[in-house]
C-alpha cells in the first residue's frame, strides 16, 4: 500500500506539539489592524490551541505528525 500524503496547506499552517495539541496562528490579522483594539492585537500574537473537533480534522490531514 502506498504512503499517505500530508496536505501541504495544513503543514504550512498548523503545528502539532509533542503532547498532541494542534497549534495555529490567530485568524483575521492580514489587514485592517488600524481599527482593531490594542487588546485584540496583543492577544492575537503567537499561536493558540485548536479545539478538539478541529484538531481531529487537522490531524487527519497530517498522518505522520501525531
UniProtKB/Swiss-Prot annotation:
Ribosomal protein keyword on record: yes
PANTHER family reported for this sequence: 54S RIBOSOMAL PROTEIN BL35M, LARGE RIBOSOMAL SUBUNIT PROTEIN BL35M
Top-level taxon: Bacteria
SUPFAM superfamilies: L35p-like
NCBIfam families in the record: rpmI_bact (TIGR00001)
An example Gene Ontology biological process: translation
Gene3D superfamilies: 4.10.410.60
Gene Ontology MF terms in the entry: structural constituent of ribosome
Family per similarity comment: Belongs to the bacterial ribosomal protein bL35 family.
InterPro entries: Ribosomal_bL35 (IPR001706), Ribosomal_bL35-like (IPR021137), Ribosomal_bL35_CS (IPR018265), Ribosomal_bL35_sf (IPR037229)
Keywords attached to this entry: Ribonucleoprotein, Ribosomal protein
One cellular component term from this protein's GO annotations in UniProt: cytosolic large ribosomal subunit
Name of the protein this chain belongs to: Large ribosomal subunit protein bL35
Signal peptide bounds: none
Short name of one Pfam family: Ribosomal_L35p
